UniProtKB/Swiss-Prot annotation:
DNA-dependent RNA polymerase catalyzes the transcription of DNA into RNA using the four ribonucleoside triphosphates as substrates. Its EC number is 2.7.7.6. This is DNA-directed RNA polymerase subunit alpha. It comes from Marsilea quadrifolia (European water clover). The gene is rpoA. In plastids the minimal PEP RNA polymerase catalytic core is composed of four subunits: alpha, beta, beta', and beta''. When a (nuclear-encoded) sigma factor is associated with the core the holoenzyme is formed, which can initiate transcription.
Length: 341
């Protein structure tokens, strides 16, 4: 019998938060137990939940900042200690919680001398700063500084091109990931035909969501993803044998392409940090300008072996991490890019 009263015999899978702690304003930890699973099921759920928690749970972030009278990102302003670039980096780190999914504006309007923090930002009612003490800039002289901020909600990462911005507006490399890390482990119990598995999931968030909220959102996302299969009818399945010349096959192929595109978009927004590779392998990939999972999947095993200081052991570590965290594998050969003739 589990702590919350769930027995193996009734086979009702239940979950419970068995540990929760606030390590800091921007680091919350939760540990969850889910059971009982039949053999093999716990690992399936663990992989799916880890991927959903890291890739499907969205958040709010500052995506751009507009400065008055600033020519370029590396400009310095008299009376301000930091460069514009340094300020943008600090704005990237600001943790926000938004109750609205739409784009919103915020204003940072202060007069020096002053040490400016996140608590000085004037936000719309639906947005709040998680940690008022997060540092932004120091104004060393009695001057006024006005910065217009754009806030958006999304999932994953977003790296904008500077070429798309004009008139003193600069992009902020936004991070829309309330979930910082996820671990899971599977533990068998019982014996023989009564052998079952317990799944433990550990979740770390940035404080904008509690781990329990993150688990709930990830679960809903996974359910929504699978719900179309609950309503499939026989007539929805194309009869390829009797209708080879119809448009059914083309429509079905188009749907498959949409699924591939969705996964491709996910990998484009997921950085290789999530693989938790050893430092040697990670640094080699970064030196080769491999920053996202999408970048990594454009290399075959043989391609990776050609990288400087990247041996078979490192390739095996990458392959194992890709499978364990994203249930995907390196291609057998370098993917062909259309137009490369």
């Amino acid at each position: 019998m589990l702590k919350d009263g769930t027995s193996v015999s009734n086979e009702v899978i239940q979950w419970k938060c068995v540990e929760f702690r606030i390590e800091s304003k921007r680091l919350h930890y939760g540990r969850f137990v889910i059971s009982p699973f039949k053999k093999g099921q716990a690992n399936t759920v663990g992989i799916a939940m880890r991927r959903a928690l890291l890739g499907e749970v969205g958040g709010a972030s500052i995506t751009s900042a507009r400065f008055e009278g600033v020519a370029h990102e590396y400009s310095t302003v008299a009376g301000i200690q930091e460069t514009i670039h340094d300020i943008l980096v600090n704005l990237k780190e600001i943790v926000l919680r938004s109750d609205s999914d739409g784009n919103q504006k915020a204003i940072l309007s202060v007069t020096g001398p002053k040490r400016v923090t996140a608590g000085d930002i004037s936000l719309p009612p639906s947005v709040k700063v998680i940690d008022d003490s997060q540092y932004i800039v120091t104004i060393t002289q009695p001057i006024s500084v006005n910065i217009e901020l754009n806030i958006e909600c999304d999932c994953g990462y977003r790296i904008e091109s500077l070429n798309e911005y004009r008139d003193g507006e600069f992009p902020v490399d936004a991070v829309f990931m309330p979930v910082r890390n996820v671990n899971y482990s599977v533990h068998p119990f019982g014996s023989g035909k009564e052998m079952r598995e317990i799944l433990f999931i550990e979740v770390w968030t940035n404080g904008s969501l509690t781990p329990t909220e993150a688990i709930s959102k990830a679960s809903k996302s996974s359910i929504d993803l699978l719900s179309p299969f609950l309503h499939t009818k026989h007539e929805d399945i194309p009869d390829f044998e009797s209708n080879r010349d119809s448009s059914s096959l083309m429509k079905f192929s188009s749907r498959v392409d949409d699924v591939d595109k969705s996964e491709g978009d996910f990998f484009k927004n997921t950085f290789i940090d999530q693989l938790e590779l050893p430092a040697r392998a990670f640094n080699c990939l970064k030196r080769a300008e491999i920053h996202t999972i999408s970048d990594l999947l454009s290399y075959s095993r043989d391609d990776l072996l050609k990288l400087k200081s990247f041996g078979k052991k490192s390739v095996d570590q990458v392959s194992r991490a890709l499978w364990e965290r994203f249930a995907t594998e390196l291609p057998n050969e370098k993917p062909r890019v259309v137009g490369d003739e």
